[in-house]
Amino acid sequence: QRLHFAQSLEDAVKDVEFVQENAPERLEVKIDVLAQIDHAAPPEIVIGSSTSGYAMSEMQVKCKHPERTVVAHPFNPPYLVPLVEVVGGKQTDPALVDWAIDFYNAIGKYGLRCSHELPGFVANRVQEAMWREALHMIANNEATVEEIDAAVTYGPGLRWPIFGPLLTFHLAGGEGGMGHMLD
């Protein structure tokens, strides 16, 4: 059996190798749940949080072992999208960030080391920039929701898994690369 139900948090984390917290996206809830997991889990166990925007430095404040806590943000839907953004907090042991990345890579995910604790991390910030532009075009009656969704779905949405947005522009710049595109 791979799926087990526990009657308490203590029972849920007593014989594990890793904990992935998935509490609601409210800072006070994340802080309390991480502190409870930290108290109940053996001290050598790494604790990952699925937060989509909070810094680990904000969430690890009540943990007795904050060095073992990392953001481990899977991208939805996680059964299809391999990305897991991994970033430590101010008190996180950098070796445990490496461990978490290796863990996710070993289970077929793509563990992306985020070098800074940015609100929303990397993927959500890039996605939100595009979303802001889409909302701007809709508000100004420049495009419809359907046009924008179709444009991304059948255009860059298909290309970006191969090249990503920056490599796409670098290649489009020809011999001068992205520098030529910026001129």
Please name every model-derived segment.
Residues 49-125:
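Rossmann-fold dinucleotide-binding core
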Residues 1-47, 54:
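Rossmann-like NAD(P)-binding element
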Residues 117-183:
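Helical "substrate-binding/catalytic lid" subdomain
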Residues 30, 79-80, 130-131:
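N-terminal alpha-helical segment
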Residues 39-42, 64, 102-110, 136-140, ...:
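Generic secondary-structure signature for well-ordered alpha-helical cores
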